Protein backbone atom coordinates (compact mmCIF):
# COMPACT_ATOMS: atom_id res chain seq x y z
CA UNK A 1 0.00 0.00 0.00
CA UNK A 2 2.88 2.33 0.78
CA UNK A 3 4.29 1.66 -2.68
CA UNK A 4 0.99 2.78 -4.23
CA UNK A 5 0.92 5.98 -2.19
CA UNK A 6 4.54 6.64 -3.07
CA UNK A 7 3.86 6.30 -6.79
CA UNK A 8 0.80 8.52 -6.45
CA UNK A 9 2.76 11.25 -4.66
CA UNK A 10 5.52 10.96 -7.24
CA UNK A 11 2.98 11.46 -10.01
CA UNK A 12 1.51 14.44 -8.17
CA UNK A 13 4.93 16.04 -7.81
CA UNK A 14 5.65 15.53 -11.50
CA UNK A 15 2.34 17.13 -12.42
CA UNK A 16 3.07 20.01 -10.07
CA UNK A 17 6.47 20.68 -11.61
CA UNK A 18 5.04 20.50 -15.11
CA UNK A 19 2.20 22.81 -14.14
CA UNK A 20 4.63 25.32 -12.63
CA UNK A 21 6.77 25.26 -15.78
CA UNK A 22 3.71 25.82 -18.01
CA UNK A 23 2.38 28.61 -15.83
CA UNK A 24 5.72 30.43 -15.84
CA UNK A 25 5.71 30.31 -19.64
CA UNK A 26 2.15 31.64 -19.83
CA UNK A 27 2.99 34.54 -17.54
CA UNK A 28 5.39 35.79 -20.21
CA UNK A 29 2.64 35.85 -22.83
CA UNK A 30 -0.18 37.28 -20.73
CA UNK A 31 -1.57 39.30 -23.64
CA UNK A 32 -2.01 36.17 -25.77
CA UNK A 33 -3.68 34.32 -22.89
CA UNK A 34 -6.11 37.20 -22.33
CA UNK A 35 -6.84 37.29 -26.05
CA UNK A 36 -7.60 33.57 -26.08
CA UNK A 37 -9.81 34.04 -23.03
CA UNK A 38 -11.80 36.77 -24.81
CA UNK A 39 -12.09 34.45 -27.81
CA UNK A 40 -13.47 31.73 -25.54
CA UNK A 41 -16.11 34.19 -24.31
CA UNK A 42 -17.20 34.72 -27.90
CA UNK A 43 -17.28 30.97 -28.53
CA UNK A 44 -19.37 30.51 -25.39
CA UNK A 45 -21.89 33.11 -26.58
CA UNK A 46 -22.01 31.45 -30.01
CA UNK A 47 -22.57 28.02 -28.46
CA UNK A 48 -25.39 29.34 -26.28
CA UNK A 49 -27.23 30.59 -29.34
CA UNK A 50 -26.42 27.64 -31.61
CA UNK A 51 -27.07 24.63 -29.34
CA UNK A 52 -30.69 23.56 -29.98
CA UNK A 53 -33.11 24.39 -27.18
CA UNK A 54 -35.97 22.33 -25.78
CA UNK A 55 -38.11 22.22 -22.66
CA UNK A 56 -37.72 18.63 -21.48
CA UNK A 57 -36.00 15.60 -23.01
CA UNK A 58 -38.20 12.95 -24.60
CA UNK A 59 -38.21 10.19 -21.99
CA UNK A 60 -38.59 6.43 -22.35
CA UNK A 61 -41.54 5.82 -20.00
CA UNK A 62 -41.86 2.09 -20.57
CA UNK A 63 -44.87 2.31 -22.87
CA UNK A 64 -46.10 4.11 -25.96
CA UNK A 65 -49.41 4.98 -27.60
CA UNK A 66 -50.67 4.06 -31.06
CA UNK A 67 -53.38 6.23 -32.60
CA UNK A 68 -55.79 4.62 -35.06
CA UNK A 69 -58.00 6.83 -37.22
CA UNK A 70 -60.19 5.17 -39.83
CA UNK A 71 -62.20 6.80 -42.62
CA UNK A 72 -65.11 8.94 -41.52
CA UNK A 73 -68.39 7.09 -41.14
CA UNK A 74 -67.00 3.58 -40.65
CA UNK A 75 -68.36 1.36 -37.91
CA UNK A 76 -66.66 0.35 -34.69
CA UNK A 77 -66.26 -3.18 -36.11
CA UNK A 78 -64.18 -1.76 -38.96
CA UNK A 79 -61.98 0.17 -36.53
CA UNK A 80 -61.56 -2.87 -34.27
CA UNK A 81 -60.43 -4.98 -37.22
CA UNK A 82 -57.74 -2.44 -38.11
CA UNK A 83 -56.65 -2.25 -34.48
CA UNK A 84 -56.20 -6.03 -34.38
CA UNK A 85 -53.91 -5.80 -37.43
CA UNK A 86 -51.87 -3.11 -35.70
CA UNK A 87 -51.67 -5.17 -32.51
CA UNK A 88 -50.36 -8.17 -34.43
CA UNK A 89 -47.51 -6.06 -35.84
CA UNK A 90 -46.73 -4.55 -32.45
CA UNK A 91 -46.71 -7.89 -30.63
CA UNK A 92 -44.10 -9.24 -33.05
CA UNK A 93 -41.50 -7.01 -31.41
CA UNK A 94 -39.46 -8.83 -28.74
CA UNK A 95 -39.40 -5.71 -26.54
CA UNK A 96 -43.21 -5.67 -26.16
CA UNK A 97 -44.95 -7.37 -23.24
CA UNK A 98 -48.57 -6.63 -24.11
CA UNK A 99 -51.15 -4.27 -25.59
CA UNK A 100 -54.43 -2.77 -24.46
CA UNK A 101 -56.75 -1.49 -27.20
CA UNK A 102 -59.73 0.84 -26.78
CA UNK A 103 -61.98 1.18 -29.82
CA UNK A 104 -64.24 4.16 -30.38
CA UNK A 105 -62.00 6.39 -28.28
CA UNK A 106 -59.58 9.19 -29.03
CA UNK A 107 -58.02 11.99 -27.03
CA UNK A 108 -60.22 14.50 -28.86
CA UNK A 109 -63.52 12.65 -28.36
CA UNK A 110 -65.35 9.35 -28.72
CA UNK A 111 -66.03 8.39 -32.33
CA UNK A 112 -66.51 5.02 -33.99
CA UNK A 113 -63.67 5.51 -36.47
CA UNK A 114 -61.01 6.19 -33.81
CA UNK A 115 -59.10 3.94 -31.47
CA UNK A 116 -56.09 3.94 -29.17
CA UNK A 117 -53.64 1.12 -28.42
CA UNK A 118 -51.51 1.27 -25.27
CA UNK A 119 -48.36 -0.85 -25.55
CA UNK A 120 -46.28 -1.82 -22.52
CA UNK A 121 -42.59 -2.62 -22.93
CA UNK A 122 -40.23 -4.88 -21.07
CA UNK A 123 -38.18 -3.36 -18.23
CA UNK A 124 -35.38 -1.12 -19.42
CA UNK A 125 -32.57 -3.52 -18.52
CA UNK A 126 -34.22 -6.35 -20.50
CA UNK A 127 -34.27 -4.57 -23.87
CA UNK A 128 -31.62 -2.98 -26.02
CA UNK A 129 -33.86 -0.41 -27.73
CA UNK A 130 -35.50 2.65 -26.23
CA UNK A 131 -39.16 3.47 -26.71
CA UNK A 132 -38.20 6.14 -29.27
CA UNK A 133 -36.24 3.60 -31.31
CA UNK A 134 -39.10 1.10 -31.16
CA UNK A 135 -41.54 3.77 -32.33
CA UNK A 136 -39.22 4.61 -35.22
CA UNK A 137 -39.01 0.96 -36.29
CA UNK A 138 -42.81 0.64 -36.16
CA UNK A 139 -43.47 3.69 -38.33
CA UNK A 140 -42.85 1.90 -41.59
CA UNK A 141 -44.63 -1.32 -40.59
CA UNK A 142 -47.80 0.40 -39.39
CA UNK A 143 -47.89 2.77 -42.36
CA UNK A 144 -48.37 -0.33 -44.53
CA UNK A 145 -51.88 -0.67 -43.05
CA UNK A 146 -53.84 1.25 -45.68
CA UNK A 147 -57.31 0.80 -44.16
CA UNK A 148 -56.66 3.55 -41.61
CA UNK A 149 -54.05 5.96 -40.35
CA UNK A 150 -52.00 4.16 -37.68
CA UNK A 151 -49.43 6.28 -35.89
CA UNK A 152 -47.29 5.27 -32.87
CA UNK A 153 -46.33 8.16 -30.58
CA UNK A 154 -44.58 8.65 -27.27
CA UNK A 155 -46.69 9.76 -24.29
CA UNK A 156 -46.20 13.30 -22.98
CA UNK A 157 -43.17 13.88 -20.77
CA UNK A 158 -45.41 15.58 -18.19
CA UNK A 159 -48.84 14.06 -17.80
CA UNK A 160 -51.56 16.60 -18.37
CA UNK A 161 -49.53 18.72 -20.79
CA UNK A 162 -50.90 17.40 -24.05
CA UNK A 163 -52.05 13.95 -25.09
CA UNK A 164 -48.70 12.80 -26.44
CA UNK A 165 -45.17 14.06 -26.94
CA UNK A 166 -44.37 16.71 -29.49
CA UNK A 167 -46.17 19.99 -30.02
CA UNK A 168 -49.81 21.03 -30.19
CA UNK A 169 -50.37 23.85 -32.67
CA UNK A 170 -53.77 25.57 -32.50
CA UNK A 171 -54.83 27.01 -35.86
CA UNK A 172 -57.35 29.78 -35.11
CA UNK A 173 -59.95 31.68 -37.09
CA UNK A 174 -59.19 35.10 -35.60
CA UNK A 175 -61.72 36.97 -37.75
CA UNK A 176 -64.52 34.61 -36.73
CA UNK A 177 -66.26 34.73 -40.11
CA UNK A 178 -64.63 31.80 -41.93
CA UNK A 179 -66.60 28.63 -42.56
CA UNK A 180 -65.25 25.11 -42.10
CA UNK A 181 -64.42 24.80 -45.80
CA UNK A 182 -62.12 27.83 -45.58
CA UNK A 183 -60.50 26.54 -42.40
CA UNK A 184 -59.91 23.15 -44.03
CA UNK A 185 -58.31 24.80 -47.05
CA UNK A 186 -55.95 26.84 -44.87
CA UNK A 187 -55.19 23.77 -42.74
CA UNK A 188 -54.36 21.74 -45.85
CA UNK A 189 -51.92 24.38 -47.09
CA UNK A 190 -50.30 24.56 -43.65
CA UNK A 191 -49.89 20.78 -43.37
CA UNK A 192 -48.53 20.47 -46.91
CA UNK A 193 -45.89 23.10 -46.22
CA UNK A 194 -45.07 21.77 -42.73
CA UNK A 195 -44.44 18.25 -44.02
CA UNK A 196 -41.74 19.65 -46.30
CA UNK A 197 -39.76 21.10 -43.39
CA UNK A 198 -36.57 19.13 -42.58
CA UNK A 199 -36.82 20.08 -38.89
CA UNK A 200 -40.21 18.39 -38.50
CA UNK A 201 -40.94 14.68 -38.15
CA UNK A 202 -43.26 13.40 -40.86
CA UNK A 203 -46.18 13.36 -40.70
CA UNK A 204 -47.39 16.60 -39.21
CA UNK A 205 -51.06 15.72 -38.84
CA UNK A 206 -54.44 16.51 -37.37
CA UNK A 207 -57.31 14.30 -36.25
CA UNK A 208 -59.86 16.94 -37.26
CA UNK A 209 -62.20 16.00 -40.09
CA UNK A 210 -65.22 17.78 -41.54
CA UNK A 211 -66.52 14.96 -43.75
CA UNK A 212 -68.22 12.82 -41.12
CA UNK A 213 -71.50 11.45 -42.57
CA UNK A 214 -74.42 13.09 -40.82
CA UNK A 215 -78.18 13.38 -41.15
CA UNK A 216 -79.69 16.84 -41.16
CA UNK A 217 -83.10 16.80 -39.47
CA UNK A 218 -85.34 19.73 -40.41
CA UNK A 219 -88.58 20.17 -38.48
CA UNK A 220 -91.56 21.51 -40.41
CA UNK A 221 -92.71 24.00 -37.83
CA UNK A 222 -95.81 25.02 -39.77
CA UNK A 223 -96.89 21.40 -40.04
CA UNK A 224 -96.22 20.86 -36.34
CA UNK A 225 -98.29 23.93 -35.48
CA UNK A 226 -101.15 22.71 -37.63
CA UNK A 227 -101.12 19.32 -35.88
CA UNK A 228 -100.82 21.07 -32.49
CA UNK A 229 -97.47 19.44 -31.73
CA UNK A 230 -94.99 21.28 -29.51
CA UNK A 231 -91.64 21.58 -31.30
CA UNK A 232 -89.81 21.00 -28.01
CA UNK A 233 -91.63 17.70 -27.77
CA UNK A 234 -90.12 16.69 -31.11
CA UNK A 235 -86.61 17.53 -29.91
CA UNK A 236 -87.13 15.71 -26.60
CA UNK A 237 -88.30 12.60 -28.44
CA UNK A 238 -85.20 12.60 -30.64
CA UNK A 239 -83.03 13.08 -27.57
CA UNK A 240 -84.67 10.29 -25.58
CA UNK A 241 -84.79 7.63 -28.28
CA UNK A 242 -81.67 8.31 -30.34
CA UNK A 243 -79.41 9.80 -27.69
CA UNK A 244 -80.26 8.99 -24.11
CA UNK A 245 -81.65 10.67 -21.03
CA UNK A 246 -80.91 10.24 -17.36
CA UNK A 247 -83.98 9.19 -15.35
CA UNK A 248 -83.04 8.32 -11.79
CA UNK A 249 -80.88 6.06 -9.60
CA UNK A 250 -81.45 2.70 -8.00
CA UNK A 251 -79.57 0.75 -5.35
CA UNK A 252 -78.39 -2.80 -5.84
CA UNK A 253 -76.12 -4.69 -3.46
CA UNK A 254 -75.19 -1.52 -1.61
CA UNK A 255 -74.17 0.29 -4.79
CA UNK A 256 -75.94 3.09 -6.65
CA UNK A 257 -76.56 2.82 -10.39
CA UNK A 258 -77.90 5.40 -12.82
CA UNK A 259 -80.84 4.69 -15.10
CA UNK A 260 -80.84 5.94 -18.69
CA UNK A 261 -83.60 5.47 -21.26
CA UNK A 262 -82.85 4.93 -24.94
CA UNK A 263 -84.35 3.07 -27.87
CA UNK A 264 -82.96 -0.41 -28.42
CA UNK A 265 -80.22 -0.66 -31.03
CA UNK A 266 -82.38 -2.44 -33.60
CA UNK A 267 -84.88 0.44 -33.53
CA UNK A 268 -82.32 3.20 -34.18
CA UNK A 269 -79.92 1.58 -36.64
CA UNK A 270 -81.31 3.15 -39.85
CA UNK A 271 -82.32 6.71 -40.75
CA UNK A 272 -85.81 5.44 -41.60
CA UNK A 273 -86.28 4.49 -37.95
CA UNK A 274 -86.52 8.19 -37.08
CA UNK A 275 -89.81 8.47 -38.96
CA UNK A 276 -91.25 5.59 -36.94
CA UNK A 277 -91.01 7.51 -33.68
CA UNK A 278 -94.16 9.17 -32.36
CA UNK A 279 -94.93 12.37 -30.46
CA UNK A 280 -98.10 13.30 -28.61
CA UNK A 281 -100.07 16.31 -29.83
CA UNK A 282 -102.16 18.67 -27.73
CA UNK A 283 -105.24 16.60 -28.69
CA UNK A 284 -103.61 13.40 -27.33
CA UNK A 285 -103.06 12.02 -30.81
CA UNK A 286 -99.81 10.14 -31.61
CA UNK A 287 -98.16 11.77 -34.62
CA UNK A 288 -95.28 9.96 -36.41
CA UNK A 289 -92.15 12.01 -36.92
CA UNK A 290 -92.24 11.12 -40.60
CA UNK A 291 -95.05 13.71 -40.87
CA UNK A 292 -93.02 16.43 -39.12
CA UNK A 293 -89.36 16.11 -40.09
CA UNK A 294 -87.31 15.98 -43.26
CA UNK A 295 -84.09 13.90 -43.36
CA UNK A 296 -81.20 15.03 -45.57
CA UNK A 297 -77.84 13.18 -45.77
CA UNK A 298 -74.90 15.55 -45.34
CA UNK A 299 -71.38 15.73 -43.98
CA UNK A 300 -69.85 17.85 -41.27
CA UNK A 301 -67.40 17.99 -38.41
CA UNK A 302 -67.76 15.53 -35.53
CA UNK A 303 -66.62 18.22 -33.09
CA UNK A 304 -65.80 21.91 -33.51
CA UNK A 305 -63.16 23.06 -31.06
CA UNK A 306 -62.45 26.51 -29.69
CA UNK A 307 -59.20 27.70 -28.15
CA UNK A 308 -59.21 30.99 -26.24
CA UNK A 309 -62.67 31.77 -27.68
CA UNK A 310 -61.55 31.35 -31.32
CA UNK A 311 -62.65 28.44 -33.50
CA UNK A 312 -59.59 26.24 -33.85
CA UNK A 313 -58.09 23.09 -35.32
CA UNK A 314 -55.37 21.27 -33.39
CA UNK A 315 -52.32 20.21 -35.39
CA UNK A 316 -49.84 17.74 -33.91
CA UNK A 317 -46.24 17.05 -34.75
CA UNK A 318 -42.77 16.56 -33.36
CA UNK A 319 -39.15 17.34 -34.11
CA UNK A 320 -37.28 15.32 -36.72
CA UNK A 321 -34.55 12.94 -35.51
CA UNK A 322 -31.53 14.95 -34.44
CA UNK A 323 -33.56 18.14 -34.09
CA UNK A 324 -34.84 19.77 -30.91
CA UNK A 325 -38.35 20.78 -29.96
CA UNK A 326 -37.24 24.41 -30.08
CA UNK A 327 -36.23 24.00 -33.71
CA UNK A 328 -39.56 22.29 -34.47
CA UNK A 329 -41.50 25.15 -32.87
CA UNK A 330 -39.49 27.70 -34.83
CA UNK A 331 -40.09 25.76 -38.06
CA UNK A 332 -43.86 25.73 -37.49
CA UNK A 333 -43.87 29.45 -36.74
CA UNK A 334 -41.96 30.14 -39.96
CA UNK A 335 -44.44 28.04 -41.94
CA UNK A 336 -47.38 29.83 -40.32
CA UNK A 337 -45.95 33.23 -41.25
CA UNK A 338 -45.58 32.13 -44.87
CA UNK A 339 -48.92 30.35 -45.30
CA UNK A 340 -51.59 31.78 -43.01
CA UNK A 341 -53.79 34.63 -44.28
CA UNK A 342 -54.25 37.72 -42.13
CA UNK A 343 -57.61 36.52 -40.78
CA UNK A 344 -56.00 33.41 -39.26
CA UNK A 345 -53.61 33.07 -36.36
CA UNK A 346 -52.18 30.42 -34.10
CA UNK A 347 -51.34 29.66 -30.49
CA UNK A 348 -49.42 26.92 -28.74
CA UNK A 349 -50.86 24.54 -26.17
CA UNK A 350 -49.56 21.68 -24.05
CA UNK A 351 -45.85 21.33 -23.43
CA UNK A 352 -44.99 23.61 -26.38
CA UNK A 353 -46.77 26.46 -24.59
CA UNK A 354 -44.70 25.82 -21.46
CA UNK A 355 -41.52 25.86 -23.52
CA UNK A 356 -42.45 29.16 -25.15
CA UNK A 357 -43.40 30.88 -21.89
CA UNK A 358 -40.44 29.61 -19.87
CA UNK A 359 -37.76 29.80 -22.56
CA UNK A 360 -36.76 33.38 -21.78
CA UNK A 361 -36.47 32.82 -18.04
CA UNK A 362 -33.28 30.71 -18.09
CA UNK A 363 -30.88 33.62 -18.84
CA UNK A 364 -32.59 35.69 -16.13
CA UNK A 365 -32.18 32.93 -13.54
CA UNK A 366 -28.56 32.37 -14.55
CA UNK A 367 -27.87 36.10 -14.35
CA UNK A 368 -29.47 36.35 -10.92
CA UNK A 369 -27.29 33.44 -9.78
CA UNK A 370 -24.19 35.29 -10.92
CA UNK A 371 -25.29 38.48 -9.15
CA UNK A 372 -26.05 36.60 -5.94
CA UNK A 373 -22.64 34.87 -5.91
CA UNK A 374 -20.90 38.15 -6.78
CA UNK A 375 -22.53 39.98 -3.87
CA UNK A 376 -21.70 37.19 -1.42
CA UNK A 377 -18.06 37.19 -2.53
CA UNK A 378 -17.93 40.99 -2.45
CA UNK A 379 -19.10 40.93 1.16
CA UNK A 380 -16.50 38.29 2.01
CA UNK A 381 -13.52 39.97 0.32
CA UNK A 382 -14.73 43.55 0.96
CA UNK A 383 -13.96 44.54 -2.62
CA UNK A 384 -15.34 44.02 -6.11
CA UNK A 385 -12.16 42.99 -7.91
CA UNK A 386 -11.63 39.55 -6.37
CA UNK A 387 -15.25 38.44 -7.02
CA UNK A 388 -14.84 39.59 -10.62
CA UNK A 389 -11.70 37.47 -11.05
CA UNK A 390 -13.46 34.46 -9.53
CA UNK A 391 -16.62 34.75 -11.64
CA UNK A 392 -14.64 35.11 -14.86
CA UNK A 393 -14.01 31.37 -14.56
CA UNK A 394 -17.74 30.65 -14.93
CA UNK A 395 -17.83 31.23 -18.74
CA UNK A 396 -15.21 28.49 -19.05
CA UNK A 397 -17.60 26.08 -17.33
CA UNK A 398 -20.49 27.19 -19.56
CA UNK A 399 -18.29 26.64 -22.60
CA UNK A 400 -17.48 23.11 -21.46
CA UNK A 401 -21.09 22.29 -20.62
CA UNK A 402 -22.51 23.46 -23.94
CA UNK A 403 -19.67 21.80 -25.87
CA UNK A 404 -20.42 18.48 -24.16
CA UNK A 405 -24.14 18.84 -24.89
CA UNK A 406 -23.42 19.58 -28.53
CA UNK A 407 -20.97 16.69 -28.94
CA UNK A 408 -23.50 14.22 -27.50
CA UNK A 409 -26.36 15.60 -29.60
CA UNK A 410 -28.27 16.78 -26.53
CA UNK A 411 -30.35 19.94 -26.27
CA UNK A 412 -30.09 22.95 -24.03
CA UNK A 413 -33.14 21.95 -22.00
CA UNK A 414 -34.25 22.78 -18.49
CA UNK A 415 -31.95 20.15 -16.94
CA UNK A 416 -28.95 21.53 -18.81
CA UNK A 417 -29.88 24.99 -17.53
CA UNK A 418 -30.03 23.65 -13.97
CA UNK A 419 -26.55 22.26 -14.54
CA UNK A 420 -25.32 25.67 -15.70
CA UNK A 421 -26.57 27.25 -12.47
CA UNK A 422 -24.80 24.52 -10.48
CA UNK A 423 -21.58 25.24 -12.36
CA UNK A 424 -21.54 28.81 -11.04
CA UNK A 425 -20.64 27.44 -7.62
CA UNK A 426 -18.53 24.51 -8.80
CA UNK A 427 -16.38 26.64 -11.11
CA UNK A 428 -16.08 29.46 -8.59
CA UNK A 429 -14.79 27.02 -5.97
CA UNK A 430 -11.58 26.35 -7.92
CA UNK A 431 -10.95 30.03 -8.53
CA UNK A 432 -11.59 30.85 -4.86
CA UNK A 433 -8.83 28.46 -3.80
CA UNK A 434 -6.31 30.28 -6.00
CA UNK A 435 -7.46 33.85 -5.33
CA UNK A 436 -7.69 33.37 -1.55
CA UNK A 437 -4.17 32.01 -1.24
CA UNK A 438 -2.75 34.56 -3.69
CA UNK A 439 -4.30 37.39 -1.67
CA UNK A 440 -2.62 36.13 1.49
CA UNK A 441 0.78 36.00 -0.19
CA UNK A 442 0.29 39.36 -1.86
CA UNK A 443 -0.73 41.03 1.40
CA UNK A 444 2.47 39.71 2.97
CA UNK A 445 4.39 41.72 0.41
CA UNK A 446 5.07 39.14 -2.30
CA UNK A 447 4.90 40.49 -5.88
CA UNK A 448 1.57 39.84 -7.52
CA UNK A 449 3.00 37.64 -10.28
CA UNK A 450 4.93 35.49 -7.87
CA UNK A 451 1.94 35.34 -5.50
CA UNK A 452 -0.38 34.13 -8.26
CA UNK A 453 2.04 31.47 -9.52
CA UNK A 454 2.85 30.17 -6.05
CA UNK A 455 -0.82 30.15 -5.01
CA UNK A 456 -1.80 28.17 -8.09
CA UNK A 457 1.05 25.73 -7.49
CA UNK A 458 0.16 25.25 -3.82
CA UNK A 459 -3.57 24.84 -4.53
CA UNK A 460 -3.12 22.43 -7.46
CA UNK A 461 -3.58 19.28 -5.42
CA UNK A 462 -6.80 20.29 -3.57
CA UNK A 463 -8.26 21.66 -6.81
CA UNK A 464 -7.59 18.41 -8.66
CA UNK A 465 -8.82 16.22 -5.81
CA UNK A 466 -12.11 18.09 -5.33
CA UNK A 467 -12.67 18.28 -9.10
CA UNK A 468 -11.92 14.57 -9.50
CA UNK A 469 -14.39 13.64 -6.77
CA UNK A 470 -17.06 15.82 -8.40
CA UNK A 471 -16.43 14.31 -11.84
CA UNK A 472 -16.55 10.75 -10.51
CA UNK A 473 -19.78 11.53 -8.68
CA UNK A 474 -21.51 13.08 -11.68
CA UNK A 475 -20.28 10.62 -14.32
CA UNK A 476 -22.98 7.97 -13.62
CA UNK A 477 -25.62 10.58 -14.44
CA UNK A 478 -24.00 11.31 -17.79
CA UNK A 479 -24.22 7.62 -18.84
CA UNK A 480 -27.55 6.85 -17.14
CA UNK A 481 -29.95 4.33 -18.63
CA UNK A 482 -33.48 3.26 -17.80
CA UNK A 483 -36.33 5.32 -16.41
CA UNK A 484 -35.63 9.06 -16.51
CA UNK A 485 -32.39 8.56 -18.41
CA UNK A 486 -32.98 11.58 -20.65
CA UNK A 487 -33.11 14.10 -17.81
CA UNK A 488 -30.21 12.51 -15.95
CA UNK A 489 -28.02 12.40 -19.05
CA UNK A 490 -28.73 16.05 -19.83
CA UNK A 491 -27.89 17.22 -16.30
CA UNK A 492 -24.90 14.90 -15.94
CA UNK A 493 -23.39 15.77 -19.31
CA UNK A 494 -23.67 19.51 -18.69
CA UNK A 495 -22.09 19.36 -15.23
CA UNK A 496 -19.41 16.83 -16.21
CA UNK A 497 -18.35 18.71 -19.33
CA UNK A 498 -18.45 22.08 -17.61
CA UNK A 499 -16.49 20.91 -14.58
CA UNK A 500 -13.88 19.11 -16.71
CA UNK A 501 -13.17 22.09 -18.96
CA UNK A 502 -13.40 24.66 -16.16
CA UNK A 503 -10.99 22.74 -13.94
CA UNK A 504 -8.37 22.39 -16.66
CA UNK A 505 -8.60 25.91 -18.10
CA UNK A 506 -9.08 27.76 -14.82
CA UNK A 507 -5.73 26.42 -13.58
CA UNK A 508 -4.09 28.50 -16.31
CA UNK A 509 -6.57 31.32 -16.86
CA UNK A 510 -7.33 32.36 -13.26
CA UNK A 511 -3.69 33.08 -12.27
CA UNK A 512 -3.22 35.18 -15.41
CA UNK A 513 -6.47 37.07 -14.75
CA UNK A 514 -5.36 37.62 -11.16
CA UNK A 515 -2.04 39.06 -12.33
CA UNK A 516 -3.56 41.34 -14.98
CA UNK A 517 -6.59 42.59 -13.05
CA UNK A 518 -4.69 42.75 -9.76
CA UNK A 519 -1.93 44.82 -11.38
CA UNK A 520 -4.51 47.25 -12.75
CA UNK A 521 -6.08 47.50 -9.31
CA UNK A 522 -2.73 48.20 -7.66
CA UNK A 523 -1.85 50.77 -10.29
CA UNK A 524 -5.07 52.76 -10.43
CA UNK A 525 -6.09 52.39 -6.79
CA UNK A 526 -2.52 53.14 -5.61
CA UNK A 527 -2.56 50.12 -3.36
CA UNK A 528 0.62 49.72 -1.25
CA UNK A 529 1.87 46.42 0.08
CA UNK A 530 3.92 45.80 3.23
CA UNK A 531 7.64 44.95 2.95
CA UNK A 532 8.44 41.41 1.93
CA UNK A 533 11.40 39.66 3.54
CA UNK A 534 13.46 37.34 1.37
CA UNK A 535 16.05 34.94 2.78
CA UNK A 536 18.91 34.26 0.42
CA UNK A 537 22.26 32.56 1.30
CA UNK A 538 21.57 32.94 5.00
CA UNK A 539 20.95 36.68 4.68
CA UNK A 540 17.53 38.29 5.14
CA UNK A 541 16.78 41.25 2.91
CA UNK A 542 13.67 43.41 2.88
CA UNK A 543 12.08 44.29 -0.45
CA UNK A 544 9.61 47.17 -0.64
CA UNK A 545 7.12 47.08 -3.55
CA UNK A 546 5.05 50.05 -4.59
Can you say where each PLM-predicted feature lies in the sequence?
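Hydrophobic transmembrane alpha-helices and their membrane-interface caps
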Residues: 372-459, 464-483, 497, 501, ...
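Alpha-helical membrane-interface segments at transmembrane helix boundaries
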Residues: 12-30, 52, 56, 87, ...
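Hydrophobic alpha-helical segments of integral membrane proteins
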Residues: 1-26, 292, 354, 388, ...
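Surface-exposed amphipathic alpha-helical segments in non-transmembrane regions
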Residues: 34, 65, 78-101, 113-213, ...
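Transmembrane helices with small-residue packing motifs
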Residues: 37-74, 126, 152, 165-166, ...
Amino acid sequence: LGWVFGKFNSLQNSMRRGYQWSLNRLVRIKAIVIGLFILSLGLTAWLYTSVPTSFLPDEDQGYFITIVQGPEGVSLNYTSKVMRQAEEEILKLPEVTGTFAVGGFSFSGSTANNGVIFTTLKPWHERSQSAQQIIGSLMGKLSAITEARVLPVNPPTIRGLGSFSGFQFQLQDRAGNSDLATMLEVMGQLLERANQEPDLQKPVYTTFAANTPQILIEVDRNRAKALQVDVNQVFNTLQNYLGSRYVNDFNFERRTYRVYVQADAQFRSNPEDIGKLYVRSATDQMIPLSDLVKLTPTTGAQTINHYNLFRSIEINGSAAPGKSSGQAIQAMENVAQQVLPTSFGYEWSGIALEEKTSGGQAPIIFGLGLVFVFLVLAAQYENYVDPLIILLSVPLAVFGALSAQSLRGLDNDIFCQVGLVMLIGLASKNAILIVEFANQLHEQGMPITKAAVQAAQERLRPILMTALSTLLGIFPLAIATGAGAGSRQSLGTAVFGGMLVATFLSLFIVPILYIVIGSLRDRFLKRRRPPHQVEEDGRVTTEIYR
